[in-house]
Amino acid sequence: MIHYLHFIGEFCFSSAVKVVEWFSENLFLKRSTMALSKRGFVMTSNARFHGEEEELELGLGSVRFTRGLGRKRILISSCVRESLSRSAVEIPVVSESPPVKSSLKRQRSRITIVSSSSSEKSRLECLPQDLLIRVICGVDHEDLKSLKLVSKSIREASLVAKTLHFAYTTPKKTRAFRNSIDLEEVSDSRHQEDDIEPPNAPRHYRWTKAKRKEQLSSVSAALFT
């Protein structure tokens, strides 16, 4: 019985508190008045039990409301609502395009770095050394110095080609004219060419039929004696 009575008492007390709050809110609304001022509509109230009165200015109008432990009641005029809606429409939306662009630039820079690092070796350098040496053997003798400065693999292949190919075959000669006067002199003297011999070129001897017969006769004499 004691527990039952205690439960009934708590229920009655809570219902009484709710009724008092309802009456206080209704009385506050009845006592509140609307006044039109130069700044707009102002809501005033004589009730002081909710807290101190404060005034809120929004655009064309100001609203006075109470702040405390109870609920807040704010009444906004139609003009203020229209001004708020217009300001909300006119507020520019800040787009997040700049950080996106910066991230895209970073990704592109990374891609270019990766592509440049992957394309450091050309197709010529990717060839095996035997084929690379054969390709370099078809180059002029004067271009070997510049090929040594390209890369390590081409430098090694050019050194091998120099020892194997260019030491036994004569490369192409290049015409050298010091100035335009030398060019005219050469053209006048029945196109005599002033050529530069390539360095370390082997000597070529011209064999005639008489020289070959002499060599063969000496060989035959040595055999039959």
Swiss-Prot record:
It comes from Arabidopsis thaliana. It comes from the Eukaryota. This is F-box protein SKIP27. It is found in: Nucleus. Keywords: Nucleus, Ubl conjugation pathway. Pfam families: F-box (PF00646). Residues 121-169 form the F-box domain. InterPro entries: F-box-like_dom_sf, F-box_dom, FBS1-like. The lineage of its organism: Eukaryota, Viridiplantae, Streptophyta, Embryophyta, Tracheophyta.
